């Protein structure tokens, strides 16, 4: 007998994201976050970089997780959501971010881009496929994408001090699989659960 998938859709807005969850989303307190049931969740988040930590918490609330799995997934999701928002939706290049950080103008540039058209209306779409033994997250931004094959190898001694690619490396080391689509604006991670 096949087990049906539960589907829940969550959309963030300018208000508190936690208040937008539908009542049928399994909650820790209710004891309904059973790992034996497959679950598909879809989310649409506004490009609000300062709320990435809160978004990660929302994404991980669906299931009770082993603490190490939660830590590793949290790290991967944080890095990939930041990339999707900053470099994807806001189209801020790695070089522009590095320069802004060095000059102390990063917060200003981020605020300006976040309120300018067409960037301010862009969203990050996340789909989570939970099964009893693994989870897959697909993160899609509305930017132009990037050539993920051209990321410098952050483990190469010549690149150790570069900022570019470090978040992707951290994410890759935290999950079992990380793949991009051809355009580079959709990334999928897979993590086997303990």
What label would you give each PLM region?
Residues 2-75, 86, 90-114, 127-129:
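Bergerat-fold GHKL ATPase/HATPase_c domain
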Residues 27-40, 85-194:
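Conserved beta-strand-loop-beta-strand hairpin that lines the nucleotide-binding pocket
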Residues 77-78, 186:
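Alpha-helix N-cap/helix-start and coil->helix boundary motif
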Residues 79, 83:
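Conserved polar catalytic motif of the HATPase_c/GHKL fold
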